[in-house]
Amino acid sequence: MTFDRDEIRSCMLFNGVTDSETEDFLKRHPCKIRRFDKGDCVITREELSENIGVVLEGTLGIYSDSYYGGHAMVGIGGRDYLFGFIAMFYNHAHSITSLYSRGCRVAYFSVPTGQTPVDFISTTSPGIISNIFDALT
C-alpha cells in the first residue's frame, strides 16, 4: 500500500523533525503500510530485526512465551507503539515473541540487511532518535 506522507509525518517518530530529515529517513528506510484484521499476526520474533514498525491506528496484542510453553499476552500497543528493529534498544527485546492485531494499520520502515544499532543511530537524525527513546521510556 502506498502511503500519505502527511500521515507518516503525523506519527510520533517524526515529531519536531524537519521535512528534509523525514525525507532522508524515508530514503534510507522505505515505508509500506499494511492493514491487519483482528487476529492477524503482525510480526514474529524472527522478523523483529527486519523492520521498524509503528502502529498508525488501532491496537495490537503483545505476546511472550509463557512458562508453560504457550504464548501469554503481556501488553497492548496502541497508536505510535514502536516495535521491530527498535526492540534492540530496550530490555525486553528478546521476551516479545509475536504481535497480533486487534484491528490495526501499521507503517513498516525497512532496515537494510546487516545494519547494526550503532549504524542506525549514527545515520539517523538526532530528532528521530530522541523520539524513539522518548517512546521507549
Where in the sequence are the language-model features?
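Cytosolic regulatory regions built on CNB/CRP/Popeye-like sensor folds
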Residues: 1-137
